Curated annotation (Swiss-Prot):
Its main location: membrane. The keyword Transmembrane applies. One of its GO terms (molecular function) is proton-transporting ATP synthase activity, rotational mechanism. The keyword Acyltransferase does not apply. Key component of the proton channel; it plays a direct role in the translocation of protons across the membrane. It comes from the Bacteria. F-type ATPases have 2 components, CF(1) - the catalytic core - and CF(0) - the membrane proton channel. CF(1) has five subunits: alpha(3), beta(3), gamma(1), delta(1), epsilon(1). CF(0) has three main subunits: a(1), b(2) and c(9-12). The alpha and beta chains form an alternating ring which encloses part of the gamma chain. CF(1) is attached to CF(0) by a central stalk formed by the gamma and epsilon chains, while a peripheral stalk is formed by the delta and b chains. Keywords: ATP synthesis, Cell inner membrane, Cell membrane, CF(0), Hydrogen ion transport, Ion transport, Membrane, Transmembrane, Transmembrane helix, Transport. This is ATP synthase subunit a. InterPro entries: ATP_syn_F0_a_bact/chloroplast (IPR045082), ATP_synth_F0_asu (IPR000568), ATP_synth_F0_asu_AS (IPR023011), F0_ATP_A_sf (IPR035908). It is a multi-pass membrane protein.
Amino acid sequence: MATEHAPTASEYVVHHLTHLNSTGHAQTSIVDFSVINVDSMFYSVLLGLLTVFLLWLAARKATAGVPGRFQGFVELLVEMVADQAKGIIHSAESRKFVAPLALTVFVWIFLMNAMDMLPVDLLPRIWEGVYASAGGDPHHAYMRVVPTADLSATLGMSCGVLLLCLYYNVKIKGVSGWVHELFTAPFGSHPLLYPINFAMQIIEFVAKTVSHGMRLFGNMYAGELIFILIALLGSTATVFGFVGHIVAGSIWAIFHILIITLQAFIFMMLTLVYIGQAHEGH
């Protein structure tokens, strides 16, 4: 009976790449704005609360004496983000908000990326058990645990950065100054160039926002998929499969630590760069 219901390799991969969403069944269309990925929302909020707690704990434990390991690490992280923010955003007033925001973004995205380090089947199996105990079909108990491997989540964050850029454009340059820039940059203030300038500005905003979210999503989705494929080696019930699963999984996990850290840093840096550009005129 166990082998009768055992999923094929393709079914295993598809199952692990399917979200728990608001409809209660697998999404069939590529784009459907009526669908909410509940798993991504849950883990994003949960890890966001964990981020706030960790930063609050670090601030609470801060002392003037010799710092402990945790405090020393947090101070090093804060100084790194503050230095990056100071080099990109020259307004001290803006940095009071943007620098803590960048630190929060880095820690939050790092924690979301780090969910990829958990065993592939750990949380999904637990969810299957809960779902089955509630009377549901465990074969339809979907659960993805890496929010940053969900394009809707990463684009949502990049859209948040876009809104901040628009806010600082208006705050720093004024409404009239920003509108003037929209129609006169980058090719000049000749009336015939107004439509071209405006189109170029819109393309720039859209391209930065889409690439900002896509870069994080693409790297984390690929990393998640590789972990799933490595997990398949362990199901082959052969010595080669078992050894390959252990060796490949260990090597990829070590390398993936660099990826999850680097992607969090890149997203944070691009956030600073885009907000910094809003402070500058063309």
